[in-house]
Structures are given as C-alpha cells and as structure tokens.
Swiss-Prot record:
Function comment: Binds to the 23S rRNA.
Gene: rplO
Annotated protein name in UniProt: Large ribosomal subunit protein uL15
Alphabetized UniProt keyword annotations: Ribonucleoprotein, Ribosomal protein, RNA-binding, rRNA-binding
Keyword Glycoprotein: no
PROSITE patterns linked to this entry: RIBOSOMAL_L15
GO molecular function: rRNA binding; structural constituent of ribosome
NCBIfam families: rplO_bact (TIGR01071)
Length: 146
C-alpha cells in the first residue's frame, strides 16, 4: 500500500454542492432557491417562530409559573441501589460514580429511601431524606453529610 493509493471508504465522503455556476451544473440560474419570494433574496430568511403574520404559538399560549434560578438540582440515589455495595464499606461520591450509580453530580447527591437496605454502610452524600436516614441507622449504618 502506498500513500497515493489510499482512498476513503465508499460513501464516506461527498462532493460539496457548487451552486450558481451555470446551467450545465444543474444548480445554476436560481441556485436551488426557486423563483422570487423572501427566501430567494439575500439575507432572506423567516425569523424563528414566525408564522406568516398569524399570532405565533409562543404568544398564543399563556404565561405560567416561575422557575427559580437558585433552585438546587440533586442527583438521586435510592437505598436499593446502595445495597449492591459490600458490608461495612464506605460509600462516598467517588464510589457512586465509579459504580455507575451517578453520572452527573449537579448540585450534589441526595439519598432517598426507596427500596430496602440490608447491609450497614457508611454513606457520605450532600443530602438525605428523613426516611432514608432512619433506614440507614436502623440497619447499623452511619450517615455523613458532606
């Protein structure tokens, strides 16, 4: 094999469309823009959400509610998921990430009480629900807020 004989796989590369270069090219004269109208002009594009003068959808629908910018979003982990760890082990943020329980830590990790925990673990997280805290301590585990 030589460098001058290497070719890309079939269908891997496409020729770019050259427009406005004569009728023989198949894309001459109107350059694939059709005849007249706003979209045929230079800079002629309809702005996003424009519906031809009709009242646009985003103005027809009522305003509703409020989303606070300061609201914290926690990644949720249930007790049933934590039951996969070994007896007496320390479950912290790194351990949860390594085991694939948590992908993105938004503003922290919150432990919820869904499912059963059968092993005593030391769990370190940013938040705990009251029920989760009770279940962990009842099994003999410890809760540490980071």
């Amino acid at each position: 094999m030589e460098l001058n004989s290497i070719k890309p796989a079939a269908g891997a590369s496409k020729n770019r469309k050259r427009i406005g270069r004569g009728t023989g090219s198949g894309h001459g004269k109107t350059a694939t823009k059709g005849h007249k109208g706003q979209k045929a002009r230079s800079g002629g594009s309809v702005k996003a959400g424009f519906e031809g003068g009709q009242m646009p959808m985003h103005r027809r629908l009522p305003k509703r509610g409020f989303k606070p910018l300061s609201k914290k979003v926690y990644s949720v982990v249930n007790l049933s998921q934590l039951d996969a760890f070994e007896q007496g082990s320390c479950v912290d943020v790194e351990a949860m990430q390594k085991s694939g329980l948590v992908k993105d830590i938004c503003d922290g990790i919150k432990i919820l009480a869904s499912g059963e925990l059968t092993k005593s673990l030391t769990i370190k997280a940013h938040k705990f629900s009251a029920a989760a805290r009770d279940k962990i301590t009842s099994v003999g585990g410890t809760v540490e807020e980071i």
